Every structure is written in structure tokens, then in C-alpha cells.
């Protein structure tokens, strides 16, 4: 197994926190399972007067073997602890290891949450989830960090893509500051890139504004690649709420593309539903509902019958439902 990354050091009175170290990759194997990837180290906190938090380290990649090794989780982003400072970004999760035999493939690592902002400062972005290989579970995206008093919430990390399994969900956006700031946008859902099973991952929800500010937009749903039978795209995330005093609701994320069907007469995949728009609380406009995902095309087969070419056409899938307005 790969070693874990070390944590970054915290700053003193002022200055940025140190970044966390990356986890090591696992070693490949032939007749036993591949090694696990190491965890990413956490980022250090910023200075007590001012300074940004350090970024979290990335998780190591799981290795290939008779069974696949697990990918390491990303390290948490450090907080901006002082009067002002931005939270550090969360580390990305490591890819899971594929498998060359009956044991299961390795699970991918999760993206880590972004650090909180200081009294004035934005929250850090969440890390992206790791890719699921050969049917392994993909890693979910990390949540964006919250702002403290004045600042915007961090964006959620993207969900990991997958082959032969479901795409992972995107992370939620962080909340805006208690006095002013917008919510962060939700992360994109993971796509399904290959295989006859699995649907696109859900987009992350947008972060809420707390007093004055707009809600964050929901993340887009993951797209679905073609398969023998059409599979569905992922749903978009809902938009965040506007501030209690003023602010618009966030827009819902669009749904993912439905997958094309390849088999004769098979129906294409349904597009993912659009996310709902976020509400406005007191003064402001509600968010728009997200667009539904496009449908996948139906499968076809052309064959010569008595010298004539005939075609069997599968019906296209259904478009995704449009999200409700806030």
C-alpha cells in the first residue's frame, strides 16, 4: 500500500498554512490484490491574524491486481482562521484499481471538503472524487467550504467518473457568509464512460446564502455513454436558497445526457431530470429549474433479408424532466 501523505503545518499569527502531502500509489500485483493508495494529508490552518488555509493532499491511486486496491481519500483543506483568509481546497480522491480476476475492483477515494473561510474570505473548493475503474465504486465529490462572515461558499467537487458502474455524486456547494456572500455551486455528477450497467451521477446541490447573497447553482448530472441497452443520465442538483434578507435562489443544474442504445430495437436511455431552482426567502427571484437531459438514440440493426435491407429501429429514450422553478 502507498503511504499516507503528511499534514501541512498551521501558520502562527499570519501566513498561509502548509499543504498536505499526497498519498502514495499502491503497487500492482499479479496473484494477489493490488495495494491501496495512501490518504492525502490535511492542509494546515492559516494564521490567527490573517492567512489562507493550505490545500489538502490528493489520495493515492489503488493498484491493479487479482483484486483491485482502493484509492485513497483526499485530505481536508485547511481553514482560513483569522480576520481574513480563504479556506484551502480539499484534495482529490485517488482512482480505484482495476481487477484481473474474481475479486472486486477497488473503490475509488472520496474528494475531501474544502476548508472554511476566515472572518472575511471564501470557503475552499471541495476535491473531486476518484475514478471508478472496471466496475469499482467511484468516489463522491467533496463539499465546498463554508464562508464565515463575509465571503462566498466554495464550490463542490465533481463526482468521479465510472466504467461499468454508476457515476458518483458531485459535492454540495458551501454556504455563503452570515453577513454577505453567495452559496457555492454544486459539483458535476460523474459520467459513465463504458459498460452496459450504471447511470450518471447526480449533480451536487448549490449552497445556501445566509443573509444577503444568491444561492449557488446546482451541479449538472453526469452523462451516460452508449451501451447495449440505453441507460439514464444523472439528475441535476437543486439550486441553493437566496439570503434571508435579499438574494435570488440558485438555478437548478441540467440533467445528464441519456445513453445511446446499440442493440437492435433497444430503447435509448432517458435524460436526467433537471434540478429544481432554489427559493428566494424575502426579496429576490426564485431560481430557474434546470433543463432536462437529452435522450439517447435507439439501437438499430440492418440485415439483408431476401436481398432487401431492412432496419430495426429502437425508439429513442425520453428527455429528462425540466426542474421546477424556485
Label for each model-derived stretch:
Residues 1-326:
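Glycine-centric low-complexity repeats
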Amino acid at each position: 500500500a502507498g503511504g499516507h501523505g503528511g499534514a501541512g503545518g498551521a501558520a502562527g499569527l499570519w501566513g498561509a498554512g502548509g499543504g498536505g502531502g499526497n498519498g502514495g500509489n499502491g503497487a500492482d500485483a499479479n496473484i494477489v490484490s493490488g495495494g491501496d493508495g495512501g490518504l492525502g494529508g490535511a492542509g494546515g490552518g492559516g494564521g490567527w491574524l490573517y492567512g489562507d488555509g493550505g490545500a489538502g493532499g490528493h489520495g493515492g491511486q489503488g493498484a491493479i491486481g487479482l483484486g483491485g486496491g482502493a484509492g485513497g481519500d483526499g485530505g481536508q483543506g485547511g481553514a482560513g482562521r483569522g480576520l481574513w483568509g480563504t479556506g484551502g481546497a480539499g484534495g482529490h480522491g485517488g482512482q480505484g484499481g482495476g481487477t484481473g480476476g474474481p475479486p472486486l475492483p477497488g473503490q475509488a477515494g472520496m474528494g475531501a471538503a474544502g476548508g472554511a473561510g476566515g472572518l472575511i474570505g471564501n470557503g475552499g473548493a471541495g476535491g473531486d472524487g476518484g475514478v471508478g475503474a472496471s466496475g469499482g465504486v467511484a468516489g463522491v465529490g467533496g463539499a465546498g467550504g463554508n464562508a464565515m462572515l463575509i465571503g462566498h461558499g466554495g464550490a463542490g467537487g465533481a463526482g468521479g467518473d465510472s466504467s461499468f458502474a454508476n457515476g458518483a455524486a458531485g459535492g454540495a456547494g458551501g454556504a455563503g457568509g452570515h453577513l454577505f456572500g453567495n452559496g457555492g455551486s454544486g459539483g458535476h455528477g460523474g459520467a459513465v464512460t463504458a459498460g452496459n450497467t450504471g447511470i450518471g451521477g447526480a449533480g451536487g446541490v448549490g449552497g445556501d446564502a445566509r443573509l444577503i447573497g444568491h444561492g449557488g447553482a446546482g451541479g449538472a448530472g453526469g452523462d451516460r455513454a452508449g451501451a447495449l441497452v440505453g441507460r439514464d443520465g444523472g439528475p441535476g442538483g437543486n439550486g441553493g436558497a437566496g439570503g434571508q434578507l435579499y438574494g435570488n435562489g440558485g438555478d437548478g443544474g441540467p440533467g445528464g445526457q441519456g445513453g445511446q442504445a446499440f442493440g437492435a430495437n433497444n430503447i435509448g436511455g432517458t435524460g436526467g431530470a433537471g434540478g429544481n431552482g432554489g427559493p428566494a426567502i424575502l426579496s429576490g427571484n426564485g431560481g430557474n429549474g434546470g433543463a432536462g437531459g437529452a435522450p439517447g438514440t435507439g439501437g438499430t440493426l440492418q440485415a439483408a433479408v431476401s436481398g432487401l435491407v431492412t432496419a430495426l429501429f429502437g425508439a429513442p429514450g425520453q428527455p429528462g424532466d425540466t426542474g421546477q422553478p424556485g
